[in-house]
UniProtKB/Swiss-Prot annotation:
Residues 356-413 form the COS domain. The keyword Lipid biosynthesis does not apply. This is E3 ubiquitin-protein ligase TRIM36. The lineage of its organism: Eukaryota, Metazoa, Chordata, Craniata, Vertebrata. GO terms for biological process: acrosome reaction; mitotic cytokinesis; regulation of cell cycle; regulation of microtubule cytoskeleton organization; spindle organization. Residues 419-510 form the Fibronectin type-III domain. Belongs to the TRIM/RBCC family. E3 ubiquitin-protein ligase which mediates ubiquitination and subsequent proteasomal degradation of target proteins. Involved in chromosome segregation and cell cycle regulation. May play a role in the acrosome reaction and fertilization. It comes from Homo sapiens. It holds the Pfam family zf-RING_UBOX. The keyword Transferase applies.
Length: 728
């Protein structure tokens, strides 16, 4: 847009302000930079058409460059030089760093950053800030606003002798302010300077002609309708806008001015309507406040009624328990008194012994008859001791499972919105957390709010909230070895559903270690089949194995086929997970040092003698006899849908204690600091087996297969993983 066009546009707006249709204060918020929250200073127009100060753009890019360098250094892992997948904190940095740096520069230059106005990523391209237009119109309006704000402060003449006079004009060509006398002296009639453009007193001087940022010597004289930005004729002939539809600057100026003027007139004409709508909104806000408080009071009343019913039932149940307790204690007391009387029968026994001394038969029979009845009764009590009452109160255990379920489903009337349900099968935690939920199609929600918090035994932590438009969300930066609770609620219009049932998930004990299967070191392509992504391997128990079996004689057996991870570990804590296919016959998983792997891989592949004791990492009897807690490897056996705990001299070796159902997903936690390796059930994040391991050497994730079998590495949870799940 030309200089005269911009000034005409500004003059039109200032005319509206002068007429009182628009106050200068009302446009103040349009003159504030969204980054620094101050009046614009040398504003630049971003590709998203928002403006931002020149210094703010530089600060944003420098901040992102610093954060890139910091994150890169923090996440460098000497023990994992071939680590491919970044940590969650790197996702944003990767997203904002794209190709855009000087050819001879070794450090990538950040050219993408989120616009502070719309929060969408804007790409500055290879030219960076130099490719942005300066918003002269906005700059002029800001300067006029500053002048209106400091009307009492005059701009002095730049050429007067001391003391200077107040300026009355500013020359845009000379970039100076003049009083009337100095202006006449320095712009004499009949000279070229007399044709200079002048405006009211200002301190903001701008170039008279807009130059193309891509072709710095060319003037802007056309407007690209596709990119919606001014261009020069070279841009149209062979530049980035060669195949775009362009129009003349005068035509674009006329069209845009008509649209802007029409829209401004419409907005000004609707001022009374807007004020009426604002009043209506104020009434609606007050009504909403009252209705919300009334709804809270009604909810409190309903819950208080439930509390009263519960208190009444509680009192009744406790009274019944107390009555039963008192009755039983009374029976025990009576029985105890009876047995206390038996102790007092010592005198009866003595009396009976004296009666036995009576020699007169008639006198003896007369006395002994009743005495015998008393002795017989005491004897029967001793022979058949039975407590007078039961001590157990099992019949008085309150069953609240049904009521608890009903209370958990407590919701609003059907006029509200149904409660979403979290899909436990599709929700999981690995390097990040993936939470998936579903909602009835007949009651589709506009949006959802996912809430999560870390479960802490010491104190109650507040819930973190994330607004989601879909029915799934990936949550990053969760703490390791922690337990989190997740719940979701739905929104439809102004209606909010209650929260769903909470889902409890456990995070891995250490950061996820990313690797792929190594297709070079020890990989036997005759027996093993590796996919293109190198995250899945299968054992082919087919024709090649039958050919190998021809050479197997009595006392010989086939060896394992090993495959390892392509990245070694020398320090730190690492966790990885995988799935063993249910049809697998025999699979060994764990860790092994590079030296031990070379020893295993040097052994004959097709057949070996049983006299050669191959190190399996567990179950052989010789290993039981010489259990070494500092061995440089640890492997466990999985097969036929069972997980076998290795034998140990310190624990029970009974089969029922060693054979467990095979988990759906198995995790391995290697702690080089403590020199141990743990095997986890990923579904419950529960440790199944722990063993010491020598971490003085480089350790590799190790796998071995025999017969039919398959291993699938757990895929990290990323945005691509979420897209794949949604497609399924």
């Amino acid at each position: 847009m030309s200089e005269s066009g911009e000034m005409s546009e500004f003059g039109y707006i200032m005319e509206l302000i002068a007429k009182g249709k628009v106050t200068i204060k009302n446009i103040e918020r349009e003159l504030i930079c969204p980054a620094c929250k101050e009046l614009f200073t040398h504003p630049l127009i971003l590709p998203c058409q928002h403006s931002i100060c020149h210094k703010c753009v530089k600060e944003l890019l420098l901040t992102l460059d610093d954060s890139f360098n910091d994150v890169g250094s923090d996440n460098s892992n000497q023990s994992s030089p071939r680590l491919r997948l970044p940590s969650p904190s790197m996702d944003k940095i990767d997203r904002i760093n794209r190709p855009g740096w000087k050819r001879n520069s070794l450090t990538p230059r950040t050219t993408v950053f989120p616009c502070p106005g719309c929060e969408h990523d804007v790409d500055l391209g290879e030219r960076g800030i130099n490719g942005l237009f300066r918003n002269f119109t906005l700059e002029t309006i800001v300067e006029r606003y500053r002048q209106a704000a400091r009307a009492a402060t005059a701009i002095m003449c730049d050429l007067c002798k001391p003391p200077p006079q107040e300026s009355t004009k500013s020359c845009m060509d000379c970039s100076a302010s003049y009083c009337n006398e100095c202006f006449k002296i320095h712009h004499p009639w009949g000279t070229i300077k007399a044709q200079h453009e002048y405006v009211g007193p200002t301190t903001n001087f701008r170039p008279k002609i807009l130059m193309c940022p891509e072709h710095e010597t060319e003037r802007i004289n056309m407007y690209c309708e596709l990119c919606r930005r001014p261009v020069c004729h070279l841009c149209k002939l062979g530049g980035n806008h060669a195949n775009h539809r362009v129009t003349t600057m005068s035509s674009a100026y006329k069209t845009l001015k008509e649209k802007l003027s029409k829209d401004i007139d419409y907005l000004i004409g609707k001022e009374s309507q807007v004020k009426s709508q604002i009043s209506e909104l104020n009434l609606l806000m007050k009504e909403t406040e009252c209705n919300g408080e009334r709804a809270k009071e009604e909810a409190i009343t309903h819950f208080e009624k439930l509390f009263e019913v519960l208190e009444e039932r509680k009192s009744s149940v406790l009274k019944a328990i107390d009555s039963s307790k008192k009755l039983r204690l009374d029976k025990f007391q009576t029985q105890m008194e009876e047995y206390q009387g038996l102790l007092e029968n010592n005198g009866l026994v003595g009396y009976a012994q004296e009666v036995l001394k009576e020699t007169d038969q008639s006198c003896f029979v007369q006395t002994a008859k009743q005495l015998h009845l008393r002795i017989q009764k005491a004897t029967e009590s001793l022979k058949s001791f039975r407590p007078a009452a039961q001590t157990s109160f099992e019949d008085y255990v309150v069953n609240t499972s049904k009521q608890t379920e009903l209370l958990g489903e407590l919701s609003f009337f059907s006029s509200g919105i149904d409660v979403p349900e979290i899909n436990e099968e599709q929700s999981k935690v690995y390097n990040n957390a993936l939470i998936n939920w579903h909602h009835p199609e007949k009651d589709k929600a506009d949006s959802y709010v996912l809430e999560y918090r870390k479960i802490n035994r010491d104190d109650e932590m507040s819930w973190n909230e994330i607004e989601v438009c879909g029915t799934s969300k990936i949550i990053q930066d969760l703490e390791n070895s922690s337990t989190y609770a997740f719940r979701v609620r739905a929104y439809k219009g102004s209606i909010c559903s209650p929260c769903s049932r909470e889902l409890i998930l456990h995070t891995p004990p250490a950061p996820v270690f990313s690797f792929l299967f190594d297709e070079k070191c020890g990989y036997n392509n005759e027996h093993l089949l590796l996919n293109l992504k190198r995250d899945r391997v299968e054992s082919r128990a087919g024709f090649n194995l039958l050919l190998a079996a021809e050479r197997i004689q009595v006392g010989y057996y086939t060896s394992l086929d090993y495959i390892i991870g392509d990245t070694g570990i020398t320090k730190g804590k690492h966790f990885w997970a995988f799935r063993v296919e249910p049809y697998s016959y025999l699979v060994k998983v764990g860790v092994a040092s590079s030296d031990k792997l070379q020893e295993w891989l040097r052994s004959p592949r097709d057949a070996v003698s049983p006299r050669y004791e191959q190190d399996s990492g567990h179950d052989s009897g010789s290993e039981d006899a010489c259990f070494d807690s500092s061995q440089p490897f640890t492997l466990v056996t999985i097969g036929m849908q069972k997980f076998f705990i290795p034998k140990s001299p310190t624990s029970s070796n009974e089969p029922e204690n060693r054979v467990l159902p095979m988990p759906t997903s198995i995790g391995i936690f290697l702690d080089c600091d403590k020199g141990k390796v743990d095997f986890y059930d990923m579904d419950q994040m529960k440790c199944l087996y722990e063993r010491q391991v020598d971490c003085s050497h480089t350790l590799y994730p190790a796998f071995a297969l025999m017969g039919s079998g398959g291993i699938q590495l757990e895929e990290p949870i990323t945005a691509k993983y979420l897209e794949y799940q949604e497609d399924m």
